[in-house]
Structure formats: C-alpha cells, structure tokens
C-alpha cells in the first residue's frame, strides 16, 4: 500500500464507505469505541474518527465537540477538554493495544465547518447553512449538479432537505458523499 491512504469512520454508520479495508475498518471501529468512552467523561461526543497513513506515519484524528446543554443550546469544546480527551484516548489505546504500528494521535474540535455525518446531525443542525456534495449528479432545474448550498431543513423520509435560493432540494441520504456546516463571511 504505497502513497497516501486514509480511513474516515463516519461515527455510528458503516454504510457510507463499503470499500474500506477490513483491517483498517476494525482498527477504526476500536479507536472509535475508545474515543467515545473518553469523550463522555468531558460531556462530549465524537464527531469523526480518521485513521490515515501520511508519509509512512500513521495518524489518528479524532474530532470531538460538546453535547448541547439541557435546553438544547450548542456548546463548543475547549482546548483543555481536547487535551483531557487526548490523554484518555492515548492511555486507552496503550492498554488495549488497538493499533499495531506507531502512530500520532490528534484530538480537536470539528471546526467551524463541522462535518454532518450521522443522520441525527441533519436534524440537530436544521436551520443552519450547509454545503452538501453528492456521489452522483442530481437533476435540478438548473441542470445536473453534485454541489448544493443552502439552509438545512432536516432529514425527512431518508431525504436531506435543503432550501436553496431557487427552492427546496431533496437529496437522497445514500447519495450524500460529504456534508458540512458553512458560513457566509
């Protein structure tokens, strides 16, 4: 396996990447389980786990964020919480010996353009500006396209619904290749 390869684990969903290596998938799932355990101690959730080889070095990237408060208000992870989660994951990985090679562990926030991965993300972030890319071009009034940007209306009957300037677009869930929050600056 030469060159750059990566394994992105859509947390709690295995349906989006059927071509991944069984060994990589197994390692990423074990890392995910340990990361979830560590994140819970800081009242956080794991957004995404990426296991990648970069220039001969294995890298584990965990994006974590605070869970909403009791009133449903969004909160954001702090640098101290990222550090705590990183130390816990590192200890858990050492104890469970999940990764057979030397690796670098990085724990961070998902960033301002947080990826939307789980179906619950499409409900939780309804009303927010999103950008979505599809696997295949979708027929629209302006012609076939793979990129959509607008206000997320939610997930309805396995369709991601987005309000664009020209109207509402319904994108089949299984066609969503990548989705993330976005902002107008």
From Swiss-Prot:
InterPro entries: Ribosome_maturation_RimP (IPR003728), RimP_C (IPR028998), RimP_C_sf (IPR036847), RimP_N (IPR028989), RimP_N_sf (IPR035956). It holds the Pfam family RimP_N. SUPFAM superfamilies: YhbC-like, C-terminal domain, YhbC-like, N-terminal domain. It is found in: Cytoplasm. Its main location: cytoplasm. Coiled coil: none annotated. It comes from the Bacteria. Gene3D superfamilies: Ribosome maturation factor RimP, C-terminal domain, RimP-like superfamily, N-terminal. Belongs to the RimP family. This is Ribosome maturation factor RimP. It comes from Magnetococcus marinus (strain ATCC BAA-1437 / JCM 17883 / MC-1). The lineage of its organism: Bacteria, Pseudomonadati, Pseudomonadota, Alphaproteobacteria, Magnetococcales. The gene is rimP.
């Amino acid at each position: 396996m030469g060159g750059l390869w990566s394994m992105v684990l859509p947390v709690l969903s295995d349906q989006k990447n059927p071509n991944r290596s069984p060994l990589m998938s197994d390692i990423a799932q074990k890392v995910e389980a340990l990361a979830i355990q560590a994140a819970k101690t800081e009242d956080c959730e794991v957004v995404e786990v990426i296991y990648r080889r970069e220039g001969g070095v294995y890298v584990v990237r965990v994006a974590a964020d605070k869970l909403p408060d009791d009133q449903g208000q969004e909160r954001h992870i702090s640098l101290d919480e990222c550090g705590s989660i990183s130390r816990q994951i590192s200890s858990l990985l050492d104890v469970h010996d999940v990764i057979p090679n030397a690796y670098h562990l990085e724990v961070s926030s998902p960033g301002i353009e947080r990826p939307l991965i789980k179906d619950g993300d499409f409900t939780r972030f309804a009303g927010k500006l999103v950008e979505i890319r599809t696997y295949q071009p979708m027929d629209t009034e302006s012609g076939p396209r793979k990129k959509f940007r607008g206000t997320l209306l939610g997930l309805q009957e396995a369709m991601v619904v987005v309000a664009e300037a020209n109207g509402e677009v319904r994108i089949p869930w299984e066609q969503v290749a990548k989705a993330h929050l976005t902002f107008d600056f």
